[in-house]
């Protein structure tokens, strides 16, 4: 890693300074997580939580120490406690409910007090003295308000720095308006409400100084292996221009670089739009991809027809229109994207 005066160039895939600790834990090490691994290769001790034991060999081959655990099973997460000061939380919430119980379990694990073994075996006299001290105390149960304030001069364990991969779906439909990170959230479905829940839990944990948290709100992720080619080949329709919605995008490699940049330079409790400069409607995006690969463009239908023909998941994206301002990304993190727009990436694609 090297320090540069003018910020971070994502095309080099190198952070501008070392992470505050060489140990990094990735929770949810899928496609984007593995891209983070490649960008950190040889510059940090990497750990990854996986719920799939069969992935252990793959992770080890990538230079990652696998930890088998499940965010839905709190007891399986014990090894994560105090493992790494830097945590990339890339795991999605569970599929039902409005509260993200997975993030709740992770925060509880990361903030669990250290358990230290006694150095000496107490003598009978010492045990009696300890018993007398305990007898003079009131209840030792920690109240709901949290743990007592540390004694003067006491140095608490170092807090975990958590970078959370959230979604721009927390804003709901904005009717195509431009918005920055100060826009109030208005989640329109349970999926987005769980993301708001995760953000809120992390902010509250940070407010009580249990962790340090930064939040990336992420739009549609694309890459060579994440393009809507199958959708185009199936001739799935898009909306006519009059009914179409604005979408936002980020290349997966640029996203990985942004997350790592946030781990070293992100302001505490700060939200960042991890978005490129693309301003396209959804159908226009599909057309650009189709043209780049020599595929026939998607047919267009009216919204009323789409409501009858398409599945609920796809429709949920077609009901929300917004355009993201990414000034913080550039002004605070000084990120220079490798692919500032979808078109910049598609120009690198060879037509068949």
Which role does the model predict for each range below?
Residues 107-127, 134-144, 150-190:
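Conserved Rossmann-fold NAD(P)-dependent oxidoreductase catalytic core, especially the SDR/UDP-sugar
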Residues 175-215:
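Catalytic helix-loop patch of NAD(P)-dependent Rossmann-fold dehydrogenases
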Residues 307-336:
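Conserved C-terminal active-site "lid" loop/helix of NAD(P)H-dependent oxidoreductases
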Residues 340-352:
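Amphipathic terminal alpha-helices
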């Amino acid at each position: 890693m090297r320090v540069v005066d003018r910020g971070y160039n994502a095309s080099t895939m190198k952070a501008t300074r070392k992470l505050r600790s060489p140990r990094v834990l990735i929770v949810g090490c899928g496609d984007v997580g593995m891209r983070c691994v490649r960008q950190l290769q040889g510059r940090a001790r990497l750990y990854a939580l996986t719920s799939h034991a069969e992935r252990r060999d793959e992770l080890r081959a990538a230079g990652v120490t696998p930890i088998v655990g499940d965010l839905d099973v709190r007891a399986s997460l014990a090894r994560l406690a105090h493992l790494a000061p830097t945590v990339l939380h890339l795991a999605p919430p569970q599929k039902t409910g409005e509260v993200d119980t997975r993030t709740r379990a992770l925060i509880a694990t990361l903030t669990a007090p250290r358990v230290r073994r006694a150095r000496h075996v107490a003598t009978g006299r010492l045990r009696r003295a300890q018993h007398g001290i305990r007898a003079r105390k009131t209840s030792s149960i920690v109240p709901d308000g949290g743990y007592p304030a540390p004694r003067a001069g006491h140095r608490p364990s170092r807090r975990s720095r958590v970078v959370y991969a959230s979604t721009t779906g927390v804003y709901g439909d904005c009717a195509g308006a431009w918005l920055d990170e100060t826009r109030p959230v208005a989640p329109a479905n349970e999926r987005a409400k769980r993301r708001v829940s995760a953000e809120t839990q992390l902010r509250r944990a940070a407010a009580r100084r249990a962790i340090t948290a930064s939040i990336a709100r992420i739009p549609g992720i694309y890459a060579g292996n994440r393009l809507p080619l199958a959708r185009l080949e199936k001739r799935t329709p898009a909306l006519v221009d009059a009914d179409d919605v604005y979408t936002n995008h980020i290349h997966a490699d640029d996203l990985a670089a942004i997350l790592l940049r946030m781990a070293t330079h992100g302001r505490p409790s700060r939200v960042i739009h991890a978005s490129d400069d693309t301003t396209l409607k959804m159908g226009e995006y599909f057309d650009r991809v189709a043209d780049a690969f020599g595929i026939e463009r998607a047919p267009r239908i009216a919204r009323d027809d789409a409501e009858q023909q398409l599945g609920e998941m796809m429709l949920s994206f077609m009901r929300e229109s917004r355009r993201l301002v990414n000034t913080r990304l550039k002004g605070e993190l000084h990120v220079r994207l490798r692919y500032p727009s979808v078109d910049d990436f598609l120009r690198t694609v060879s037509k068949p």
